[in-house]
């Protein structure tokens, strides 16, 4: 942090989570900017001035919060232009409301591949480098067009979603993906 606080955590990328990791940091100060770097085998993978995050202010503080909402995005030039525009307005967090990405399958391998392809879009990655991401799903990333909660295989879609989206919580722990901020 700017005050010199140093926090270290470790996460293992394993095949059963498709190589996805989530870092859970503790004892962070409210309203504080933290620089970060990611290392593998002692070598930096990610580092630099643009790799930081800011914690939310305390519950007692009064501040303006800028949220960007989006949905129905693809890995194309049009969506990349939108990610650049969103980054330019400098939101504190991004909330994706579904169809990000379009998957239209409940096959776990397809789900994982599509989430990985979507996450690899350079402008999307740059946007999220220093912002929180919260997400829910809609029909195309849950299963197929116009499907509902009765879709067979939805547990595989939920598994891939949890692997690739680091929400604070996911439903009741067994089903659903809803979350809350505080």
Give the location of each predicted region.
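Acidic, histidine-bearing metal-coordination/catalytic regions of metal-dependent phosphoesterases
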Residues: 1-73, 88-90
